[in-house]
Curated annotation (Swiss-Prot):
Organism: Sulfolobus islandicus rod-shaped virus 1 (SIRV-1)
Bilayer-crossing regions: none
Protein name as catalogued: Uncharacterized protein 56B
Family annotation (InterPro entries): 56B_RHH, Arc_rbn_hlx_hlx, Ribbon_hlx_hlx
Pfam families cross-referenced by the UniProt entry: 56B_RHH
Biological process per Gene Ontology, one example term: regulation of DNA-templated transcription
Length: 56
């Protein structure tokens, strides 16, 4: 059973601003719209996969 503090730590988010190619951003937005995803969800999943493949 998780404590309230552990649960809150899991939900903490940080702002992460980046510069991205406009075409790539458009493709990502279209993909998210078609797949009912938020941009944050898609980006987090992509980064997790990227790091997992590289033992990061």
């Amino acid at each position: 059973m998780q404590t309230q503090e552990q649960s809150q730590k899991k939900k903490q988010k940080a702002v992460f601003g980046i510069y991205m190619d406009k075409d790539l951003k458009t493709r990502l937005k279209v993909y998210c719209a078609k797949n009912n995803l938020q941009l944050t969800q898609a980006i987090e999943e992509a980064i997790k996969e990227y790091l997992q493949k590289r033992n990061g």
